[in-house]
Amino acid sequence: MKRKLKMDNLNINFINDDEHPIPSQDLLLKCLQLVANKHHISHAEVNLNIVSNDEIQQINKQFRNKDKPTNIISFEFEKPQGLPDDIANDFLGDIVIAPAVLENEAKEQNKELNDHWQHIFIHGLLHLLGYDHQDDQEAEVMENLEIQLLAQLGIANPYIEQENQNGR
């Protein structure tokens, strides 16, 4: 199933061929709106691919050299030479999410599934905007921004339990 969801000049192209269960698409569009507003982006388009654990494991192995399923992988758009700016500037990239991984994580971490979806989608959007967490300083910047954005949605800090477990 392919569906385009649009709010003003913000678009999410949902690609969910196997019709995996996903939360309200309006929730995810609200996440895009928050991230876009925070970064003063007036036009944005994202592809959101919903896949199985097997599919995301293959993608994870191919692009990250990790042979295991993961919750999300983001691919920032790289503008091909010759593509007009007015076409390329709006497209942020592709996000791939495995709903079964999110469901398991939400259960293990005692989180509401919709809250976890919104957190992970925001996390992926931030990757598309160049944020990363390769070192502790980058991780802190990205996590703090996620916490701020999630608070605007009424979602608690998703890192509290992890911080306590990891001693961070």
Swiss-Prot record:
Co-factor remark: Binds 1 zinc ion.
Alphabetized InterPro entries for the sequence: MetalPrtase_cat_dom_sf_prd, YbeY, YbeY_CS
rRNA processing is among the record's keywords: yes
Any one of the GO BP annotations: rRNA processing
Top EC class of this enzyme: hydrolase
Keyword annotations of the record: Cytoplasm, Endonuclease, Hydrolase, Metal-binding, Nuclease, Ribosome biogenesis, rRNA processing, Zinc
Any Pfam family hit: YbeY
Organism domain of life: Bacteria
Binding of Zn(2+), residues: H123, H127, H133
Purpose of the protein: Single strand-specific metallo-endoribonuclease involved in late-stage 70S ribosome quality control and in maturation of the 3' terminus of the 16S rRNA.
Family: Belongs to the endoribonuclease YbeY family.
Record protein name field: Endoribonuclease YbeY
Gene that specifies this protein: ybeY
